[in-house]
Amino acid sequence: MRIIVLVTVVLLSACSVLPALPEWQGPEGRDHADLGLIVDLRNDAVLTPAQLVARLQDSEALLVGERHDNPDHHALQLWLLQALEQQRPQGSLLLEMLEPGQQARVDSVRRDLRAGHAPGDLAQALDWQKGWDWNLYGPLVSHALMQSYPLLQANLGRDEIMSI
């Protein structure tokens, strides 16, 4: 009986469905023939979203970038994070938008959220910097704050930058 349960669990986990890809939001590139294609630049192979996730799921670290003002890039980052969460435990998420002085706030907000106490203004509670459009970054940050893995600062503070 145990073997049947184990095989069933393995088969069901292999059939996990990726989150739906986000709808395109921005006007940029809408008439480009390659809009939405995922291309492996090493060999020009076109990948499906599932193939991309399968290739990335065993990576120890991923560096994912975006054009800071492109809503589609932000939506795809959140999609990729959620897709990878379905395939493996995440280690942590580091954001260049977070500076060392904000880490204590991030940790405090996370504890509050887990205790069921959501701040009225999440961006303000995190001391989110105005230069990073919260409307674009907020969905990813909000999602990450509710996960079991840490959300960490990856930027240097002003004093650290000035000392270089």
Regions found by a protein language model. Give the residues of each.
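C-terminal motif of bacterial Sec signal peptides marking the signal peptidase cleavage site
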Residues: L12-A14
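A substrate-binding/cap region within the structured catalytic cores of diverse enzymes
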Residues: S92, A104-I164
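Sec-dependent signal peptide recognition
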Residues: R2-T8
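Short, flexible loop segments at the rims of nucleotide/cofactor-binding pockets, characterized by
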Residues: L37-D44, N70-P71, W128-G131
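Membrane-embedded segments
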Residues: H68-E96, P100-R110
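Zymogen propeptides
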Residues: D44-E85
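Short, basic, glycine/proline-bearing loop/turn elements
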Residues: D31-I38, E60-R67, P119-D127
